[in-house]
Amino acid sequence: MTVGSLPAPLVKPSAPRPLLPILVAAIALALPCSITAADDALAPQRADMVREIAAVAAAAAAQSGRHAIDPRVMAVMGQVPRHEFVPDAQKPHAYENRPLPIGHGQTISQPYIVALMTDLMMVKPGDTVLEIGTGSGYQAAVLTGLARAVYTIEIIEPLGRHACDRLKRLAYRQVACKVGDGYYGWDEHAPYDAIVVTAAASHVPPPLIRQLKPGGRMVIPVGAQFLTQYLLLVEKSEDGTVSTRQILPVRFVPLVGKH
């Protein structure tokens, strides 16, 4: 959950371009059916958000190494109702490309960062994904449009309980959630094809490396609060060798727990 990821480059979004219609339709069929009239009314705002994500991704390519976000990820970002995952007072800002407070000192991440982290995981339709830091449930909802199953852990009990209820209400049935210390992962369902951590750790947790499948990818912010943090891509090769690569500087809330 970002508290203000690397300031978005000051770019003017390019002229609207249609998202791949067939791909968007396919993603829509895969997502829950509880789309309301309000969701439909906000579709233009989601489309604007997606265009801004694309513009920021292009402007940040020199740092991130990603010149464009996978169209599958962009299609899902254009379908998931972000306004359902923020407090009422923040709903007017739901489709702005910035983090928003969700209570308990936590935030919902900037849409560009959600898209980038999801893109870096390279999630495939049959994959099982672990998320550390459920927050309001938005990242988990995005992942359900791409993966077979999503497991998500939140250490702050009220946030975790409300996020789980919200995901159930919105019919995201591929998600299993629990309250716990995400540092230790969720061994019962391991190994995972991809892992995403939405809070900054001082180091990459060894339990998460163990639970990552050979050939899998983990995206995690690492660094101390109020100091430099970097978004890391952790890859485990088929022979178990682990490599890491810095993607870009970010600013996340800290990963808390008894570790």
Curated annotation (Swiss-Prot):
It is found in: Cytoplasm. Its main location: cytoplasm. Transmembrane segments: none annotated. One of its GO terms (molecular function) is protein-L-isoaspartate (D-aspartate) O-methyltransferase activity. Keywords: Cytoplasm, Methyltransferase, S-adenosyl-L-methionine, Transferase. It catalyses: [protein]-L-isoaspartate + S-adenosyl-L-methionine = [protein]-L-isoaspartate alpha-methyl ester + S-adenosyl-L-homocysteine. GO terms for cellular component: cytoplasm. Its EC number is 2.1.1.77. The active site is at S109. GO terms for biological process: methylation; protein modification process; protein repair. Belongs to the methyltransferase superfamily. L-isoaspartyl/D-aspartyl protein methyltransferase family. HAMAP family: PIMT. This is Protein-L-isoaspartate O-methyltransferase 1. The gene is pcm1.
